[in-house]
């Protein structure tokens, strides 16, 4: 489900088509773009059409674009009300990614939208994208930010274990820490803001089952030690059923070229492969390229995670059957609000506001929801991205 790094593939395996996005009005207040009635109607129609489609094949996968936007906007309103007329001049917060990737553009849009309201009340914040996806870089940033008077720190950990002690030390000094994108259970992080990864993996498993029924599947990810990968694949295997067997787990070490070549080798070595579950954000495009070069379009079904441009292109062309999407916008948006509230209101008051919105999951999970992009409902996602000024995740 993850995003990440390395080189871009250039173009998707399918034809590069221009995204058709509906225009949406922007607001001067710190709110997320509202889902239009047309988009909602389109999502309903897409789901209805898919539900009535004949069993088997990509057309049988039911898409969804609802996420958890309404609940998170309700929570935002409550936080704003609780802050009220309080000054946020003592708030200094950071959003630290796990590397430099186009995936974070959507999260940055959400962070910036939240900071418009928060900075108007005196808060300051920085969006920090390390050029290297290394645990040591994140540890160094945490130590530096803590020493420079930051009051709150949001992080997508490269390696959870490497941050356990540094987070504990920072929290002991008064820093608030929130995990997003990948949970940090067992650490001093207060909560996790993001997709319930097991649920997202379950949706991927269901989609694969709807498309192929049964058969051998390859799973590929950039890291098999990352909590989000482990949870996604566990959810996939739980919900795919006994008829689908993951026969190979490929580690591409967050390198696109490696992902493509390893998948090509896997397809060449095993003609029985019927599906690929592509976990990291670039893996969908890599899988599309591998399947296309093997002339296996229609024979090998791809279910991917996230919505990088290459993935979108391949969903639109039918090379990828479905992609399971997160809502990075709200990872950035809610991280800013929760960290600011924790400083302004205190931990107990902030958690009292947030706790009713937790869902089942590790580390106090504030869910940003799960979306399922198919060829039938891709325009719903394009409309949202257009409204926040980007073309893809």
Show the residue positions of the predicted features.
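Hinge/beta->alpha junction and helix N-cap segments in small-molecule ligand-binding domains
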Residues: 67-75, 96-110, 126-138, 158-160, ...
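Short, well-structured alpha-helical segments in soluble
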Residues: 135-150, 259-272
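An alpha-beta-alpha
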Residues: 93, 97-101, 111, 202-249, ...
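Hydrophobic alpha-helical
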Residues: 155-172, 236, 253-314
């Amino acid at each position: 489900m993850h995003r990440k790094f390395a080189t871009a593939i250039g173009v998707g395996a399918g034809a590069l088509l221009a995204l058709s996005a509906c225009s949406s009005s922007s607001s001067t207040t710190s709110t997320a773009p509202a889902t239009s009635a047309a988009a909602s109607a389109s999502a309903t129609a897409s789901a209805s059409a898919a539900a009535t489609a004949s069993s088997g094949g990509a057309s049988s996968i039911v898409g969804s674009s609802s996420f958890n936007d309404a609940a998170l906007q309700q929570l935002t309103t409550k936080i704003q009300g609780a802050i009220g007329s309080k000054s946020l001049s003592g708030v200094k917060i950071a959003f630290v990614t796990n590397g430099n990737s186009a995936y974070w553009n959507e999260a940055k849009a959400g962070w910036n939208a939240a900071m418009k309201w928060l900075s108007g009340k005196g808060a300051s914040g920085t969006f920090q994208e390390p050029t290297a996806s290394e645990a040591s870089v994140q540890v160094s940033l945490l130590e530096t930010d803590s020493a420079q008077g930051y009051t709150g720190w949001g992080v997508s950990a490269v390696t959870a274990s490497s941050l356990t002690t540094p987070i504990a030390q920072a929290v002991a000094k008064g820093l608030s820490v929130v995990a997003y994108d990948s949970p940090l259970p067992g650490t001093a992080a207060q909560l996790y803001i993001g997709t319930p990864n097991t649920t997202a993996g379950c949706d991927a498993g269901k989609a694969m089952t709807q498309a192929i029924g049964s058969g051998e599947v390859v799973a590929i990810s950039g890291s098999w030690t990352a909590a989000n990968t482990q949870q996604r694949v566990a959810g996939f295997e739980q919900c795919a059923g006994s008829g689908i067997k993951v026969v190979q787990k490929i580690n591409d070490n967050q390198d696109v070229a490696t992902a493509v070549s390893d998948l090509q080798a896997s397809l060449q070595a095993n003609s029985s492969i019927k599906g690929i579950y592509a976990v990291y954000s670039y893996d969908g495009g890599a899988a599309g390229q591998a399947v296309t070069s093997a002339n296996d379009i229609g024979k090998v079904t791809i279910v991917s995670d996230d919505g990088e441009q290459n993935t979108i292109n391949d969903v639109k062309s039918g090379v990828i059957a479905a992609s399971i999407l997160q809502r990075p916008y709200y990872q950035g948006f809610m991280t800013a609000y929760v960290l600011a509230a924790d400083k302004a209101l205190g931990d107990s008051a902030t958690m009292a506001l947030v706790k009713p919105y937790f869902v089942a999951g590790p580390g106090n999970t504030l869910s940003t929801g799960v979306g399922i992009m198919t060829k039938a409902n891709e325009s719903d996602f394009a409309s949202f991205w257009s409204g926040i000024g980007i073309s893809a995740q």
